[in-house]
Design a protein with these regions (language model features):
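Amphipathic alpha-helical scaffolding segments comprising HEAT/armadillo-like alpha-solenoid repeats
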Residues: 11-25, 46-61, 80-92, 114-123, ...
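Conserved structural position within tetratricopeptide repeats
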Residues: 61, 92, 111, 143-146, ...
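Helix-start (N-cap) detector for alpha-helical repeat units in TPR-like alpha-solenoids
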Residues: 65, 118, 152-153, 186-187, ...
Length: 238
């Protein structure tokens, strides 16, 4: 270990240089082990020992590609409500691997951000919506929104209920409530666009789809919808 003395100060290169490199290596090393082993609990434990969610959030925006990928993955396991917006920004990262990891973590935290009781109720509503049982999902979704009004995903699921029941005005209102609480919720932008299309608001639908793609460039279905709308417009104008 090299010691440097200057004006009575005793500083070591280990303290000024090596320590930050060790912290960096711990995260990337844990990430590489995870890619080989797929042992998520071990990865989470290794990262949690040395990194706070705030530090991971910083690395998500400032680290190199591997560091950003590792941070995005970690935040899905160790993050909290304050991690949702940074992950939402990372959905537009130049690296596709970062975008994919951020998307998985973003969706996980949207579902997990509420209290455990509300989380379980949301999972029930999601299960009903996924099965197309929108009428059965409506009442528990409305109760959940009333009990946990800050829970963005609850508003999203309520919007899906209304949309499935072809009540597009109520669905529009619920999608807006979701986006008011989480502006990076790109599935809500896409759902809102579908409502506006059904209500004949083509320009607004296009704007919502473009916002969806600005947030998450990998939503190919939104890109296809934009092309279809523009193609129909050209055919109508002709």
């Amino acid at each position: 270990m090299l010691a440097i003395e200057n004006r009575g100060l005793h500083i070591t290169t280990e303290e000024t240089v090596t320590s930050p490199l060790v912290r960096t290596t711990r995260l990337t090393s844990a990430y590489r082990r995870f890619l080989t082993s797929a042992d998520a609990p071990r990865f989470a434990a290794e990262v949690d020992e040395f990194y706070s969610p705030a530090t991971l959030t910083t690395l998500l925006s400032r680290g190199d590609i591997e560091m950003r990928r590792a941070s995005a993955l970690s935040l899905g396991m160790l993050g909290n409500r304050s991690s949702i917006e940074p992950l939402g920004r990372a959905l537009g990262d130049p690296d596709r691997g970062v975008r994919l990891a951020s998307d998985d973590s973003f969706r996980a935290l949207l579902v997990r951000e509420a209290a455990p009781l509300h989380h379980q109720k949301l999972l029930k509503v999601m299960h009903l919506n996924d099965g197309g049982e929108h009428a059965a999902a409506l009442a528990p979704a409305m109760i959940l929104v009333d009990q946990a009004p800050k829970y963005a995903e609850a508003h999203h699921q309520l919007a899906i209920c209304w949309q499935g029941l072809e009540n597009y005005y109520q669905a529009e209102s619920a999608y807006r409530s979701c986006l008011w609480r989480c502006r990076f919720h790109y599935p809500a932008w896409q759902g809102l666009a579908r409502c506006w299309l059904m209500l004949g608001e083509t320009d607004r639908a296009l704007s919502a789809l473009e916002l969806c793609l600005q947030i998450c460039p990998d939503v190919e279905s939104a890109r296809l919808q934009i092309r279809a709308i523009r193609r129909r417009r050209r055919q109508t104008d002709a």
